[in-house]
Amino acid sequence: MSFVIATFYHFVKLSNYYDMKDEIKAACDNFELKGTILLAEEGINATISGERNAINKIFNFLCSDYRLKDLTWKESAAKYQPFSKMKVRLKREIVNLGVSNLDTSLRGKYIDPDHWDDFISQPDVLVIDTRNEYEVKLGKFKNAINPYIQYFREFPQWAKSFSKNKNLKVAMYCTGGIRCEKSTAYMKSLGFNDVYHLKGGILSYLERTHNKNGNWEGECFVFDDRIAINSSLAPSNKIKCIFCSNQVSADELKSVSRGQVVCSDCNPS
C-alpha cells in the first residue's frame, strides 16, 4: 500500500477557528487520515497522510469553506504511513514567529519554482534561508545566507540586525513556503521593500525543477518519520546516527529531535 503525504497552509482570518476543530477532526478520522493540523486565527497549517482517495476527500471538504479555497498544497509519496495518529490543534500562530499583530497579507512577492534559479542568480539578490540551523546543515541553496537560528521565533532578532541591508533585493525560502511567507511580511514591516519568496518552498522547487541546475545542495529535512528527502523527493539514505555515525533508515530509526537522529542499536529501549 502506498500513501500520499499532503502538506498545506493558508494565511486567512479564521475568527471561528475554535469551532472548526471538532468538525475537521471528525472528517479526518472518517477518512482514516493521520498527521497534524494546526488552526489559529491567522489560518491553517498541516501535514497529513492517507490513501489517495482519502486525501482527495479531505481536500474537497476543506475547500468547501470559501476561506480555504486557496490552500497552498503540496504532495509527496511514501511506502508507509509516516504518522501514528491524527491531531487537530488550536494555536496562537500556525507558525511561531512570536510577533503579535503582524499583517501577513503584506507579504513579499512570490517567485515561481520554475523562475527561482534565474532570479537568485542575479548579482543584486541576497538569498536567505529562514529555516532552523539543524535543517540548514542537511542542505540549502547555493550561496544562501544562514541566520543560524535554533527556532523560527529567533528570526525577528536576526532580521533586525540585518536591517542595514533593507535597500537590497531579498529572496527567502523554507521547506514548504509558510515560514518564508510569514517572514517576508515581517521583513516588510521592518522597511525592506524588495522582498520575494519561493512559492511552495523547497518541496515545490524540487518537484517542479528536479534540481536540474544543481542549485540545491544536500538533503531537505521534513517533519515526519522520513526525516529527510533527497532532490528526487525520495526518503534520504544519508541520515546518520549522532552516536555511532551509521546511516539510519526509517526501519532503524529510534528517535529524532530537532534533527538529532538516534538508531535502534544505540537506543534499544
Swiss-Prot record:
Domain Rhodanese span(s) in chain numbering: 121-214
GO molecular function per UniProt: oxidoreductase activity, acting on paired donors, with incorporation or reduction of molecular oxygen
Swiss-Prot/TrEMBL keywords: Oxidoreductase, tRNA processing
Keyword Ligase: no
Catalytic activity annotation: uridine(34) in tRNA + AH2 + O2 = 5-hydroxyuridine(34) in tRNA + A + H2O
Known EC number: 1.14.-.-
Catalytic residues in the record: C174 (cysteine persulfide intermediate)
GO annotation (BP), single: tRNA modification
UniProt family annotation: Belongs to the TrhO family.
NCBIfam families, per database record: PRK00142.1-4
Chain's role: Catalyzes oxygen-dependent 5-hydroxyuridine (ho5U) modification at position 34 in tRNAs.
Record's protein name: tRNA uridine(34) hydroxylase
